[in-house]
Regions:
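N-terminal first-folded block
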Residues: 2-34
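Short secondary-structure boundary segments
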Residues: 29, 51-53, 77
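Acidic, metal-coordinating helix/loop segments flanking the phosphotransfer/catalytic sites
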Residues: 35-42
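Extended, charged amphipathic alpha-helical "stalk" segments
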Residues: 38, 53, 63-64
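Periplasmic-binding protein-like
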Residues: 46-50
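Glycine-rich nucleotide phosphate-binding loop and flanking beta-alpha elements
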Residues: 55-57
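C-terminal structural segments of small proteins and small subunits
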Residues: 62-89
Length: 89
């Protein structure tokens, strides 16, 4: 089975990932990030990258995926730099 890769975050940070063929979801609010995460998780995504700024608004939603092999939810810094929460996750 082939899995896809998705990225969730603000437009400036995640738009470049389209160059690699990743699915990109723009989210500036927690509700948008939560909806995008649920949508990608319900489809055939093996890895979902989320900017730390978005992840900070939906911590409890992300925690649902802890201990699951798929999808792997990975926090990444945005274009402003790291908040440090990706390292502690």
């Amino acid at each position: 089975m082939t899995y896809k890769i998705g990225v969730i975050g603000d437009k400036e940070s995640v738009l470049p990932f389209k160059l690699f063929g990743f699915t990109v979801c723009f989210a500036d609010e927690g509700s948008e990030a939560k909806a995008a995460l649920r949508k990608l998780a319900s489809e055939e995504y093996g890895v979902i990258y989320i900017t730390e700024a978005c992840a900070a608004t939906i911590k409890e939603e992300i925690e649902r995926f802890n201990g699951q092999s798929l999808p792997a939810v990975v926090l990444i810094p945005n274009h402003d730099g790291t908040l440090g929460i990706g390292l502690s996750a």
